[in-house]
């Protein structure tokens, strides 16, 4: 029997969903603490930091400083994750308020670090396996599954390989065991994630690793629904798109950050791909019935000229992505682009404003296309007194939108799970919908 200590833990997980999986592993090791959202009352404050781009680093630092100010006497403040790893040589002196620092290699040893009150930085990047206990947060029906760590790409702007290392894929069998274990606990919707999902098993000499995973999950039949995030253009193929399309479990959801469309910019960004390849993949994705396509763009990479930006702008308006993340270039140490001549901030801001207008127009169109017709959805939890929170089954959690259920044709109380719903109204970036039936 697991006995709770009379101690409280406040966990703050910053950054991406991959970081969240590592945070959930740490919660699994600290199961005997009582969770609290109040840092002031916590005996342990654990901040899993992000160190991806400048804005994320600033958020991590500010969160640490706020926690240091709020923590009660005798409480332990821990900074783990990417920021700590990336700046491990200087961070201890820069933020002396922190009691324990650890990077990206020791999430499964967090209980030992707290007991010994000591820092720990291992050389090997941690990759969660099926035997690592996790406490899933945020949902009783959805879980993330991390399939690999690190990245072998050499993008000019990205520092991730410098602190996350080279591609390190999990064994397929380990992933299947984790999926089965989580499904038995009621998690029947999953999102598979990595830095570069489409390169899964490349490090083990297999070019069709993600296709193998899709087919194995289909055969296993433990899940009702799933989707994949972070496809990389150079390792995405028409065969992979076809495997997703033909899967009864994986949704027709395509998240492929293209970063740019101009051939000259793709070369400057060292993306190991071309406009022609991008277009071939994107057109194939669009041909898939009821596909949902998300991408990411970087604006203002060094040497991006006006004609390259105009080419990007025209393409985005023509293609009409369902969702689009638009980032300003962030100059990061230990990257090729760091020392290149920068595009003026004023120019970057103007370009972002123009692209945001295009993105919002097509995003709203994508939302409105769901109105007044039955769609498959996942109801996750109650939202306030009168609503339930749901999402289109194709969507990834948090990032693609929100549906509020305000009516139901069921004769029994609504609970988290898979339902057919009918959206009836789109207001303030939220869809309102009625539940029709479970499936």
UniProtKB/Swiss-Prot annotation:
Its cofactor is [4Fe-4S] cluster. The keyword Transport does not apply. Residues 137-368 form the Radical SAM core domain. Its EC number is 2.8.4.4. It catalyses: L-aspartate(89)-[ribosomal protein uS12]-hydrogen + (sulfur carrier)-SH + AH2 + 2 S-adenosyl-L-methionine = 3-methylsulfanyl-L-aspartate(89)-[ribosomal protein uS12]-hydrogen + (sulfur carrier)-H + 5'-deoxyadenosine + L-methionine + A + S-adenosyl-L-homocysteine + 2 H(+). Its main location: cytoplasm. Belongs to the methylthiotransferase family. RimO subfamily. This is Ribosomal protein uS12 methylthiotransferase RimO. The gene is rimO.
């Amino acid at each position: 029997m697991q006995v709770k200590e009379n101690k409280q833990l406040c966990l703050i997980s910053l950054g991406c969903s991959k970081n969240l999986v590592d945070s959930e592993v740490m919660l699994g090791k600290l199961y005997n603490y009582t969770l609290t959202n109040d840092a002031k009352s916590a005996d342990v404050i654990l901040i899993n930091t992000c160190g991806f781009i400048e804005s994320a680093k600033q958020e991590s630092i500010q969160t640490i400083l706020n926690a240091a100010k709020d923590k009660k006497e005798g409480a332990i403040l821990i900074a783990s994750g990417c920021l700590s790893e990336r700046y491990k040589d200087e961070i201890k002196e820069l933020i002396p308020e922190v009691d324990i620092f650890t990077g990206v290699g020791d999430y499964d040893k967090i209980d030992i670090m707290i007991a010994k009150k000591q820092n720990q930085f291992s050389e090997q990047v941690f990759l969660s396996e099926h035997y690592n206990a996790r406490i899933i947060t945020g949902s009783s029906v959805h879980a993330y599954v991390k399939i690999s760590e690190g990245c072998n790409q050499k993008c000019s702007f990205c520092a991730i390989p410098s602190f996350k290392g080279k591609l390190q894929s999990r064994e397929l069998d380990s992933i299947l065991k984790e999926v089965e274990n989580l499904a038995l606990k009621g998690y029947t919707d999953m999102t598979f994630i990595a830095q570069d999902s489409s390169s899964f098993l490349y490090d083990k000499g297999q070019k069709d690793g993600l296709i193998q995973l899709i087919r194995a999950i289909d055969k296993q039949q433990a899940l009702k629904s799933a989707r994949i995030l972070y496809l990389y253009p150079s390792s995405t193929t028409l065969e992979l798109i076809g495997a997703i399309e033909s899967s009864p479990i994986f949704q027709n959801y395509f998240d492929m950050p293209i970063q740019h469309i101009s051939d000259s910019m793709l070369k400057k960004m060292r993306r190991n791909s071309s406009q022609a390849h991008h277009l071939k993949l994107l057109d194939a994705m669009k041909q898939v019935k009821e596909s949902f396509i998300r991408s990411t763009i970087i604006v203002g990479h060094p040497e991006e000229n006006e004609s390259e930006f105009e080419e990007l702008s025209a393409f985005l308006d023509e293609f009409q992505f369902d969702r689009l993340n638009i980032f300003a270039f962030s100059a990061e140490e230990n990257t090729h682009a760091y020392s290149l001549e920068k595009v003026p901030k004023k120019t970057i801001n103007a370009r972002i404003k123009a692209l945001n207008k295009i993105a919002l127009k097509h995003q709203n169109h994508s939302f409105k296309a769901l109105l007044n017709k039955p769609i498959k959805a996942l109801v996750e939890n109650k939202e306030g007194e009168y609503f339930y929170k749901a999402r289109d089954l194709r969507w990834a959690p948090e990032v693609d939108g929100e549906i509020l259920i305000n009516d139901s044709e069921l004769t029994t109380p609504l609970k988290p799970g898979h339902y057919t719903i009918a959206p009836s109204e789109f207001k303030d970036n939220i869809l309102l919908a009625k539940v029709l039936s479970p499936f």
